[in-house]
Amino acid sequence: MAPVGVEKKLLLGPNGPAVAAAGDLTSEEEEGQSLWSSILSEVSTRAGSKLPSGKNILVFGEDGSGKTTLMTKLQGAEHGKKGRGLEYLYLSVHDEDRDDHTRCNVWILDGDLYHKGLLKFAVSAESLPETLVIFVADMSRPWTVMESLQKWASVLREHIDKMKIPPEKMRELERKFVKDFQDYMEPEEGCQGSPQRRGPLTSGSDEENVALPLGDNVLTHNLGIPVLVVCTKCDAVSVLEKEHDYRDEHLDFIQSHLRRFCLQYGAALIYTSVKEEKNLDLLYKYIVHKTYGFHFTTPALVVEKDAVFIPAGWDNEKKIAILHENFTTVKPEDAYEDFIVKPPVRKLVHDKELAAEDEQVFLMKQQSLLAKQPATPTRASESPARGPSGSPRTQGRGGPASVPSSFPGTSVKKPDPNIKNNAASEGVLASFFNSLLSKKTGSPGSPGAGGVQSTAKKSGQKTVLSNVQEELDRMTRKPDSMVTNSSTENEA
């Protein structure tokens, strides 16, 4: 209690209030200074951590691989216009924590090697450290993937060599890239997926930061800059399975070769599909992570065959060997083009465009064709054996020979118009058929009846075979002889 009483006396003494006021003033000044220092430090930190400008993305790929469509989709535009030579666009990058914006330059090289000289306008020796390279491969044509990647990688290597970067600077870029590759760490579970600026890494001990040695086929082609292999049109995997009989073995074989290529260049691998909007957001986050250092919390994805994602530094030969366990008809060391064979080209038959022929030329051709043809006979000369009614005559059987005559030597006389031929012929026919009917009803079982029937059939056949018009002509020409012949037949 004594110390408390002494403290009270000191505070209430003649100089006590003054001492207390001075002490309070000193504490307020210290608080004000600390507040100003914190504000200044925050401002300086924000100024120092502002998103850098001048970052570049260099895109390579074949014509029709979808590289322009892919980058246009990442830009947020609905439709992009295909350029020629060297295309340019930009990606908008936003830091949500510090409300900062910047633009990332995107350069897309034409698929024709003729335009590779334009790379000097996109990337220089000064801007190379701030550049990210994207190799685009078309998965709808997997037989072209490896050849395309090798071609564009050699084009980039040739361009870097032409820059004549000092060896010390180039070795520094390569060492930094190797360190970034080795420092890859698996994202922790439960981390938020929003892109945030990367802070300083905290580690418990130096043993955890020891970099593992690189494998035999890892970073054998170190370009000194980050590389990303993007496979587009991965929605075509189902089409490959239906039309080209691709199986899981084919897809695993393709993936194994792609991952080996990525190991050689220290590249990341991602399968995308603009049509199905698959892995596009993941691609954007990984680009800003590698370019601006944003936090990235997505682990490797190898389960779905059309949505593979392998970040740089995660893969190795042992993980790739897991794919080889499913190989039955192919070996891991087999050449890519020996197993992934280009299908035969189906020739499309196009309808030829027909040009209208000149009218006069057409008529001249028709005239020449008609002149070459033999003269066609007229109707009268075409059917000389036909009668006026058009029915053919029986060959080898003349009109007069078909009817027996009592006067074979008599000549044919002209008919007399005064005689009624029709009435006489009708009377003869009526008497003839009446005699047949009377004989048939009188003795149906007698042999004579059968003979009469056969005779009637024969005469009927003769009547059918003979020409009607010829019979009429004969009857009009020889009325007398016809009446005599008819009576003779009745008596028989």
From Swiss-Prot:
Task: Tell me the superkingdom of the source.
Answer: Eukaryota
**UniProt KW Nucleotide-binding keyword:** yes
Q: Where is this region: Disordered?
A: 187-206, 371-423, 437-492
Q: Which residues carry this modification: Omega-N-methylarginine?
A: R397
Using the record's annotations, give every residue carrying the modification Phosphoserine: S194, S383, S391, S443, S446
Family label: Belongs to the dynein light intermediate chain family.
Where does this protein hold ATP?
A: G61, E62, D63, G64, S65, G66, K67, T68
Q: Which UniProt keywords apply?
A: ATP-binding, Cytoplasm, Cytoskeleton, Dynein, Methylation, Microtubule, Motor protein, Nucleotide-binding, Phosphoprotein, Transport
Gene that this polypeptide is encoded by:
DYNC1LI2
Q: Give residue spans, biased composition: Polar residues.
A: 371-381, 452-469, 482-492
Q: What is this protein called?
A: Cytoplasmic dynein 1 light intermediate chain 2
Q: Which organism is it from?
A: Pongo abelii
Is ATP-binding given among the entry's keywords?
Answer: yes
Q: Entry's InterPro entries?
A: Dynein1_light_intermed_chain, Dynein_light_int_chain, P-loop_NTPase
Q: What does this protein do?
A: Acts as one of several non-catalytic accessory components of the cytoplasmic dynein 1 complex that are thought to be involved in linking dynein to cargos and to adapter proteins that regulate dynein function. Cytoplasmic dynein 1 acts as a motor for the intracellular retrograde motility of vesicles and organelles along microtubules. May play a role in binding dynein to membranous organelles or chromosomes.
Q: What SUPFAM superfamilies does the entry give?
A: P-loop containing nucleoside triphosphate hydrolases
One GO BP annotation is:
microtubule cytoskeleton organization
